Swiss-Prot record:
This is Homeobox protein TGIF2LX. It comes from Pan troglodytes. SMART domains: HOX (SM00389). Residues 1-58, 125-207 are annotated as: Disordered. SUPFAM superfamilies: Homeodomain-like (SSF46689). The keyword Cytoplasm does not apply. It holds the Pfam family Homeobox_KN. The gene is TGIF2LX. InterPro entries: HD, Homeodomain-like_sf, KN_HD, TALE_homeobox. Residues 10-39 have a biased composition (Polar residues). May have a transcription role in testis.
Length: 241
C-alpha cells in the first residue's frame, strides 16, 4: 500500500512540475513576439519620422521662390535684404531660403534657362528688343557725326579750281542729307564770293613786320633824309665868299 501510494505520488510529480512550464511557454512566446513586433514597428517608423522632419516646403512658398528665381534667372543670388523680404512673404526662415536656393540653382535653374532659350516667343521678343536697342544706338550716334553745322564749322572753299571729279562729287546732292546740310552747302559759295572780293593789298594789312624787305628800304630812306639834312646845315654854316 505504501508502495502504491508512493507510486502515484511519484508519477504525479513530473506532471505537476512540467505542467506549469508548458502552460507558461505560450504566454512568454506571445510577449516576446509582441516585443519584437514593437521593435520592428519602431525601426520601420524611424524613416517615416525622418521624412516628416525633412518634409517639403509649402506649395505657396515654393511658388513665390520659383517666381523670384525666374525673374532673376540670369543672376539667381538674392541679397540679404531680398532674403529677408522672401522670408516675410513665405513665412520661412533665412536658412530654409538659403538652402532652397542652393538646391534650386543646381536642379531648377538649368531647366529654366533651357526653356527660355527654346521658347520661340521669348526668343522673338528678345530679338526685337535687341534690334530696337541697336537702332536706337545707331540713331543716337548719327547726329553726333553729321549734325547741323554752324557758321563756325563751315570750311572756306579754296580759290583755285578743283578737279572735275571732285566738283562733280560735291555738286551731287546726298539724298539722305538733312535740310540743314543743304542750307550750309548753299551758303558756302556766298562765303567764297566774300573772300574773293576782299582786296589783299589794303594798307591796313601791309606792315613792315610782315615784310622784311620794306623795313630795310625804310631804313635806307631815313638814312638818306638824315644825310640831306646834315648837308643843308653844313651849307648854311659855311661863310659866303
Amino acid at each position: 500500500m505504501e508502495a502504491a501510494a508512493d507510486g502515484p505520488a511519484e508519477t504525479q510529480s513530473p506532471v505537476q512540475k512540467d505542467s506549469p512550464a508548458k502552460t507558461q511557454s505560450p504566454a512568454q512566446d506571445t510577449s516576446i513576439m509582441s516585443r519584437n513586433n514593437a521593435d520592428t514597428g519602431r525601426v520601420l517608423a524611424l524613416p517615416e519620422h525622418k521624412k516628416k522632419r525633412k518634409g517639403n516646403l509649402p506649395a505657396e512658398s515654393v511658388k513665390i521662390l520659383r517666381d523670384w528665381m525666374y525673374k532673376h534667372r540670369f543672376k539667381a543670388y538674392p541679397s540679404e535684404e531680398e532674403k529677408q523680404m522672401l522670408s516675410e512673404k513665405t513665412n520661412l526662415s533665412l536658412l530654409q531660403i538659403s538652402n532652397w536656393f542652393i538646391n534650386a540653382r543646381r536642379r531648377i535653374l538649368p531647366d529654366m534657362l533651357q526653356q527660355h532659350r527654346n521658347d520661340p516667343i521669348i526668343g522673338h521678343k528678345t530679338g526685337k528688343d535687341a534690334h530696337a536697342t541697336h537702332l536706337q544706338s545707331t540713331e543716337a550716334s548719327v547726329p553726333a557725326k553729321s549734325g547741323p553745322s554752324g557758321p563756325d564749322n563751315v570750311q572756306s572753299l579754296p580759290l583755285w579750281p578743283l578737279p572735275k571729279g571732285q566738283m562733280s562729287r560735291e555738286k551731287q546732292p546726298d539724298p539722305e542729307s538733312a535740310p540743314s546740310q543743304k542750307l550750309t552747302g548753299i551758303a558756302q559759295p556766298k562765303k567764297k564770293v566774300k573772300v574773293s572780293i576782299t582786296s589783299p593789298s589794303s594798307p591796313e594789312l601791309v606792315s613792315p613786320e610782315e615784310y622784311a624787305d620794306f623795313s630795310s628800304f625804310l631804313l635806307l630812306v631815313d638814312a638818306a633824309v638824315q644825310r640831306a639834312a646834315e648837308l643843308e646845315l653844313e651849307k648854311k654854316q659855311e661863310p659866303n665868299p
